[in-house]
Regions:
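Helix-to-loop junction immediately C-terminal to a conserved catalytic motif
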Residues: 61
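Conserved ABC transporter NBD signature motif
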Residues: 69-76, 89, 123-127
């Protein structure tokens, strides 16, 4: 008898945190955080302001080094690795606050997201995909990103991450705009 249901062995975690603790100076921001995310899953971290959601994402993406515990991505230990190394592995972090390059055009912001890619055809295809998802970005492609509305800047920040063709995107406060 065969089963079409995937087991955890068939779909190992893409992201795994085990007993992670991080702090800002002497103040523990998170402790004992463990989670797993498998390919195809959408995971959400919920909590009130100050609960540590942003700290978890910063720890995963290498912006903040954990004091304890481990972080693995695609089976590779990325605990306390350089953020650039983590990006090269295919893990992108879109921070809260609509982080765009305000003096660059919308198009150039998108191309900045693809800076690690070498497949020009794929970059062009993904640019068209982004424009299909967010037509306003195509309309404003030659406008400086700093002139976009808050919501449009958030669209651009998420789209820039998509341009890297990542395996996993961490979105911090994606509806803030």
């Amino acid at each position: 008898m065969s089963s079409s249901t995937a087991t955890p062995l068939d779909n190992p975690p893409v992201l795994k945190l085990l007993n992670v603790e991080s702090a800002y100076g002497p103040i523990k921001a998170i402790r004992g955080v463990s989670l797993q995310v498998r390919k195809g899953e959408i995971a959400t971290v919920l909590g009130s302001n100050g609960a540590g959601k942003t700290t978890i994402l910063k720890t995963i993406s290498g912006i903040l080094d954990p004091r304890k515990g481990s972080v693995a991505f695609k089976g590779l230990d990325i605990t306390a690795k350089d953020p650039a190394f983590i990006v090269q592995q295919g893990l992108l972090h879109v921070p809260e606050g609509r982080e765009v390059f305000p003096l660059l055009s919308v198009r150039d912001n998108l191309l900045m997201g693809a800076y690690t890619r070498r497949d020009r055809d794929g970059v062009a295809r993904d640019m068209e995909m982004v424009y299909a998802y967010f037509p306003i970005l195509k309309e404003r492609s030659h406008q400086d990103a700093g002139l976009l509305s808050g919501g449009q800047q958030q669209m651009l920040a998420i789209s820039r991450a998509l341009m890297a063709n990542p395996d996993l995107i961490l979105l911090d406060e994606p509806s803030l705009g």
